[in-house]
Amino acid sequence: MASSKLLKERIESIQDTMKITNAMYLISSSKLRKARQNYQNVLPYFTRMRDTISRVVPHLPDEPEHPFFHERDLENPKRAYIVLTADKGMAGAYNQNLLKFLREHADQNDRFYVIGQVGYRALFRKDPRLVEDFHYGATAPTLQRARDITVDAIDDFKSGKLDEIYIVYTKIQNALTSEPVMERLLPLDRAHLMPAPKGLGDPRGEVEMFPDAWTVFEQTAPIYMHGMIFGAMTESFCAEQSARMTAMDSATKSAKDMIHDLELEYNRSRQGSITQEITEIIGGAAAVQNNE
């Protein structure tokens, strides 16, 4: 059995650790609420932009096909994955699950554009598919960061450097679980952007566009993709904070259990020491009486 002094030191050490895990839980909770609020603030804008594109797409000519819809019929298309990981650890298996999902779906010739320090460090000089000069942080997603990534993605797609671009991120399924998902950014799915039919009649509706539908789509489609990336970044950041809250809550509960067990052991140790001292005192007193 460990000494009372050593047990007391262990209890104090675990109590200090528990204060840290509890503080990290509260910080992640605050960041989660703020990130969700920021996303809700801009969601109406991107929702309206999505509705606008749905009204524009039916008016686009079938020929020539807009480059954003062009499916390049290649045997080995050049694919890129924009991967959203975290800047920090201590979030359970959040980063590991995402990277495992990525490796399961990617081919040897694909390219990884990683956002987040943890994912970047995990692949740096270990996986040749990592684009090392693409380096963005994942903390506190901003519209400007999402816009910069969108511009780079569109330029690489239009120039033919890339044939397909996907976003890989962690999506919150419910209050307790989240899982990695993959969504295609480019080329866009024309059928997915078509408006839902509302009764009989032409889904194109009576809409006049100036100067033409092609130009309007050329201006609005990048904003739609910008919204896709910002939404994925925010969702991923929220999932990270949720995972960290779960991990820190579990760590705090484990610390409480350890403290409880150690306190029982500490009390038994003290009780044993006191009993031994009493026994020694009684034995000493008896010896004195016998000598007298």
Residue ranges and their predicted role:
Residues 1-292:
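C-terminal beta-strand-loop-alpha-helix "lid" module of Rossmann-like NAD(P)-dependent dehydrogenases
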